[in-house]
Amino acid sequence: MKFSTLKTVLIGFIFLPALFSCSTVPKDIPEELTAQELIQKGQSEFENGRYVASLAYYNAVTERYAEYPALYLEASYEIGHLYMKQKKYDKAKVVFQEILDIYANSQPGTLPGSYNKLSQVEMQKLQDKN
């Protein structure tokens, strides 16, 4: 086998996975999916390392269910967690601060407390990095 042919084959093996991973990003997210289905798909994509697709599903929740605070907070927290995993700390900080602001401006007991506490923990991690 000639060197140039071997080189072409090796390059193909290197870039082929990247090509297929890009094809998993949803172009259109079905409108009939519930918030829980969207979150589940986002988590599945995250676990498989497909962060762009994961973000698309979580963003769909924040856009479609913005009037449902518990769903909005859950998806927002997942977005912040995703940014932390990618080491996009500036973006994560914005998301977690928004979550904390929502809690600060709401009546106590009206929202699930878990995302407030989780966001506080993540913000502390961000401060420790500085």
Where are these regions (language model features)?
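Structural signature of alpha-solenoid helical repeat junctions
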Residues: 33, 70-71, 108-118
